[in-house]
């Protein structure tokens, strides 16, 4: 079982979310990672244990998409970030605040535009980073709304969710116990 520790940071270098994943495999969309029920997500001042399985897709784009199992507030959650750097069992990227989100009803929106506006000034995002982040956000928003793969519901993600269950198992009772975190 190959594990990858995800270590996100803010542009100023301060730590953001960290969590452990397992490598599921690769396809035309990129490298698929998974985190099972009970995975600990931590950042300064906050932590929770994941209530449902989640997939993470590593590409060379300015984003880190995640795909949630049913029963969560988000079906798709895409962090706009610098292109992820995966080396030696660790993935590093700078979170650039913007998130493209699709809820279980299909409603899709951009979250944290206010944070992006504030942090681009406070943390001094270079113009090329601002341009790349806003372009990635627009591109991903269009793809999620259009249902383009890999944002096509379970068509692309179902085999990877099955692979995750094979590798780390899945437990409805563990999911119910973790539900108290609300994630």
For the regions a protein language model found, what residue spans apply to each?
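Cysteine/selenocysteine-centered motifs that mediate thiol-based redox chemistry or coordinate metal-sulfur cofactors
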Residues: 135-183
């Amino acid at each position: 079982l190959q594990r990858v520790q995800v270590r996100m940071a803010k542009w100023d270098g301060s730590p953001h979310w960290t969590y452990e994943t397992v490598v599921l495999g690769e396809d035309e969309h990129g490298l698929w990672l998974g985190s099972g029920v009970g995975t600990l997500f931590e950042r300064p001042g906050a932590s929770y244990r994941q209530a449902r399985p989640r997939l993470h897709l590593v590409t060379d784009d300015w984003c880190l998409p995640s795909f949630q199992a049913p029963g969560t507030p988000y079906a798709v959650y895409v962090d706009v970030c610098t292109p992820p750097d995966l080396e030696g069992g660790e993935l590093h990227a700078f979170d650039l605040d913007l998130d493209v989100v699709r809820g279980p009803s299909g409603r899709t929106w951009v979250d944290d535009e206010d944070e992006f506006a504030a942090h681009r000034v406070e943390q001094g995002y270079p113009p090329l980073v601002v341009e790349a982040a806003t372009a990635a956000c627009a591109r991903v928003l269009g793809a999620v709304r259009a249902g383009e793969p890999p944002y096509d519901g379970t068509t692309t993600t179902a085999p990877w969710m099955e692979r995750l269950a094979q590798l780390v198992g899945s437990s409805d009772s563990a999911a119910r116990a973790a539900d108290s975190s609300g994630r």
